[in-house]
A protein has these predicted regions:
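Short, intrinsically disordered N-terminal pre-domain segments
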Residues: 1-12, 165
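Terminal beta-strand-rich extracellular "head" domains
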Residues: 20-165
C-alpha cells in the first residue's frame, strides 16, 4: 500500500518498507565472492519516497566472516548494479578469533523524489572468494535469525536537527 499521508512530519521515523526472509523456513545461505552480487532475489525492500526525499535503509544478516573483510552495498536491480559507489561500505574486518556474528548496517539515501516508488536489493562481497558465508532463517531451534531489510523515512534537513552530508 503506498504512503497516503501528505504532511512531512507524519513520515519522520515511519517504517515505509520492510522485508524479512527466513521466518519459520529452512535455513539458507550465500557464499560471497570478490565481486558484488545480490545475495538472494528476495533480499530487497520496496518503498515510496517520503516528502523529505531521505530514507535510511537498514539490513541485518548473520555471517561467518573467517578473518576476511566484508563489504555491503545497495543495488537498483536484482542482478547487482550499484546504486552508487558511496553506498558500498566495509562492514566487517578480520576478527582475532571467530568471526561469526550478526551485522546490522544502515545507509542514508538522499535526493529521492517524494511520492516515487523505489526498490533496492542487498549486495555483498568479500576480499577473498568463498571465504565468507551469509546465513539466515530456520525452522528448528538454534538456527539463524531471519534476514531483515527495511526503509525508514527520515526528516527534511532543517538547521541542526537533521543534517545529511
Amino acid at each position: 500500500m503506498p504512503n497516503t499521508l501528505t504532511k512531512a512530519e507524519n513520515f519522520d521515523g515511519r517504517i515505509i518498507g520492510y522485508t524479512t526472509v527466513g521466518i519459520d523456513a529452512a535455513d539458507d545461505s550465500f557464499t560471497l565472492t570478490d565481486s558484488f552480487a545480490v545475495t538472494d532475489s528476495a533480499h530487497k525492500v520496496k518503498f515510496v519516497a517520503p516528502p523529505s526525499g531521505v530514507v535510511e535503509i537498514f539490513v541485518s544478516v548473520y555471517g561467518d566472516f573467517l578473518r576476511r573483510f566484508a563489504y555491503f552495498g545497495l543495488s537498483d536491480n536484482a542482478t547487482y548494479n550499484t546504486l552508487d559507489v558511496t553506498h558500498e561500505h566495509i562492514v566487517a574486518q578480520p576478527p582475532t578469533a571467530s568471526g561469526d556474528r550478526v551485522i546490522n548496517h544502515q545507509w542514508v539515501i538522499t535526493g529521492l523524489t517524494a511520492g516515487t516508488a523505489y526498490e533496492y536489493w542487498f549486495g555483498a562481497k568479500s576480499t577473498h572468494s568463498l571465504a565468507i558465508v551469509l546465513r539466515w532463517g530456520g525452522n528448528a531451534t538454534e538456527e539463524y535469525a531471519p534476514f531483515i531489510m527495511k526503509a525508514t523515512a527520515l526528516p527534511t534537513a532543517v538547521a541542526d536537527f537533521a543534517v545529511y552530508g
